[in-house]
Amino acid sequence: MTDRLASLRAISASAKSMMSIAAARGAQPTAPIQTAPVHFDPLPTPYLDGIRARLTEVKLPPKALKSALNSYDQACARWRYSLDESFSQAARSVSPHNLHLLSTLRFRLYTEQVERWAVQVLQVAEQWRAEMEKQRAHIAASTDKSKKPRPKFHSEYTPLLELYFRFNAYPTYADRRVLAEKTGMLTRQITVWFQNHRRRAKGPLPRMTPTAKIPLEEFERERENLARKLLPMLLPPHLRPITLGNNKTPDLTTSSRARALPPAKEDKPPQVTRKTSKKVPKTAHPAPSTLVAPSQDTVMADAISTKKTKKAKSKQCADIEMKDSSKPKRRKMKKLPKGVVGTADVAMCIDPPQVPKKNKVKPKKSMAFDSQAELAFAQAAYPSPSKYAWVHTRKPQTDAPKAKASSVTSDVARLGKGRPGKPSPPASSTVPSRRVSTRLNAMRPPYAFPARYDSAAVPMTFAVAQVTKFTFATDSASFGFKPRISTRRPNITSDAMSQLVSSFERLRLLSVELSVSRNPPLPAFEHQRLVDLRVEGLTSGEVTALHFTPGAYAARLAVTYIPPRAPLPSTVLDLPRALRARLVHPMVLPETVTQPDAFAPFIALAERRARRKARKEKKRQEEKQAKKDKKERKKAGLPHRAPSTVDAPDVSSRASSLDSDVSTSARKSSKKSKRQPSSSSRASSVASSGRTPSLSSTSSRRSSGMSMPSTPGPEQSLPIVAASDFALGGEEDVSMDADLMAQLFGSDENADAVGYDLPMHPEPFTADMITFTSCADGALGDMTADVNMPNLGQSSIDDMNWTASVGSNAQDPASQESGGDEASHWLDISFDRPTTTSQINVLGGTYSCELGGSDNMNAPLDFSDLTFGLDTGADYFSGFNNTIGGTTIMV
């Protein structure tokens, strides 16, 4: 309190000195501001009669009219009262010369808001009228069923149904819904069509499983063939081929028929015989025929009557002349169309004129198909969907006008009850997306829908067929569902503002150093933040120039794995500085934690099976050699050996082999035995090799029939392999003994008491081997570390156990005074506070890390503003064994 009083006195003295300086320079004091209340002209009331008359013209019900006018009048009254109160208070601090401006602003604000509300009230009539029309249409559609039109069957999509029927005669419900949507018909119509088609079909009907898919290539090939067959029927009239007797084309006159037929030659008419229809000599030059159509029918009848075994099928088409270099010319005479029959005044050309032979050059096919026939084929192959089909070409867009400003939307709520609800956008389809069949996904390439040509997706033979693109709707509004309301609040915090507030807070805390007395004491969390800032080595002048990042992570140069949890709110980046200040103390517990070997059972089993396999192989070789010796003795005529003499060496050799197998792993083999090792010794040496985790060879794993354990997960501990399980590679197999271990890894004082199975460190644990980070709860419970252990490689965070305790291992802060004068400047503040101690178990060794704590056990630790940063040009973690790489650290 005394500090604040002194500060206030200093501020008062500074203000008085400034006033005296201003008066000395000739500054004039301003006139006193009047305190008398200011009265403004009353605001006009809204014109309710005009609004009532306009609402009555549109025949708004009296109840709705009264409710709208009452809400409008009450809103205007509340607005007048709010303006009077606020402007009366503002007028007390405004100069009398500017009161007219304040009055003008008050009147303008009132009139603008009242006019906006009047427009909203007049819109109630239009919304009510639209709602009434919608209800009338719904009532008429639901009650009057006699006038309801019968759904039309779109026969132009029958080929689609027939093509689907060829693949599957029993469509599922989802398939029927999709077919109905594509054809623009009802699902009931599709169901009835398939029922009738199955009843009329003969033979076995195809039936696919619900999860099967239609073969796309075959489906596209059949569709294209079907489209080509239907091409003449689907073409427009001006593109159809000209055929005589077509009912859709006008009858040809005599002059038009003469122009349509090729010119005839003036030669003698040939004699009509039975051979005329079969063969005509090359020298025959027929003249224009004068036979009428009935005589031609008689000739054709005589020619056909001679064939008793076959009946020729006649088709209505023009005469065709077959040309071949090795065979004589033949003329096929077909029956003329019915349109020509009975016309005797038309000259009929039996043989076309002889045209000199020319070597025609085949036109090159161009890749761009811009002809009308190709365009017609494209339109026939991919017809546009029916106008009755629900085709989603784009997302539905509502035509409702957007609000001009957010203030208008917020003012609508002041109108009270009676305002109409916001109309929901009309649904363009009722088929949910999850009901679409997986089988018809193969039919999604454009079958009955227009699509742009894409050579990669739809490789067809035309390029300018369609101009629109079909897309399946995936949003909820397209299927009639209301959009999900987002409950997430917008983030309105500003990074610049947060950084500014944080900088001023640090400046305020650091200014405590300059104060003479430190009473009253700071709260626990502010005290901890001040200690952290002092540890960082900042001063009040450096705080404003340093940029802070509250959400920074740990030093990425030294961290091998960051657990995927909530972002760490604080970091410790400058580990050497923290070590010099004795905030981190690496300590080894007297009782070293030794974890069991998880691979020992598998290694033992592999060794046993390898020895068993070696014994069987040796026995088989001995039996084979015995049979060979017996055969040689029999061939040489030597007497047979006694059974006792045969079995004794076998037993002794088997026993010796067992002894040798047991002793092979514990003794040194010579160079000669290394060049020619036995199978048992090879298996045992391979099984006991130090290649973790695959501690057995491929042959041992295959023979054992079991797999080795996988790499431990995040919740498991790293298996520590005993020292006796390691085999050093070299020219000889070396067994691990105490002398060799002491020579390689150094002597251990507790080796006699603990044993050789404990993990050994070749050198003392140094501070540059570990980096840690703190978590949000204040204790170092979730940490990341990088341990640089020799001969063991990199260790992951998944292989370590971390425990933390707050205030349990408080140490005497007097031991921390060796940090120098810089550290002793603030150690007296943190004398009575407990410490935060974290224990880290790394490869069997336990280390404790201490960081400043709090004098209140219940107060949570706040590390949100604690950041330790490295200098821009320095790299304090260059000696770390980093698997991620990189040297930059974001601060």
UniProtKB/Swiss-Prot annotation:
Domain of life per record: Eukaryota
Ranges of biased composition (kind: Basic residues): 328-337, 627-638
Alphabetized UniProt keyword annotations: DNA-binding, Homeobox, Nucleus, Transcription, Transcription regulation
PROSITE patterns from the UniProt entry: HOMEOBOX_1, HOMEOBOX_2
UniProt-listed SUPFAM superfamilies: Homeodomain-like
Region annotation Disordered: where it falls in the sequence: 241-291, 319-339, 393-437, 610-718, 800-822
BP terms from Gene Ontology: sexual reproduction
DNA-binding region: 146-205
Bias (Low complexity) ranges: 427-437, 651-667, 676-710
Alphabetized GO MF terms: DNA binding; DNA-binding transcription factor activity, RNA polymerase II-specific
Any one Pfam family match given in the protein's UniProt record, by short name: Homeodomain
Ranges of compositional bias, category Polar residues: 244-257, 800-818
Annotated function: Specifies A-alpha-1 mating-type. May regulate the expression of genes specific to the homokaryotic cell type.
Protein name from the UniProt record: Mating-type protein A-alpha Y1
Organism of this sequence: Schizophyllum commune (Split gill fungus)
Highest classification ranks of the organism: Eukaryota, Fungi, Dikarya, Basidiomycota, Agaricomycotina
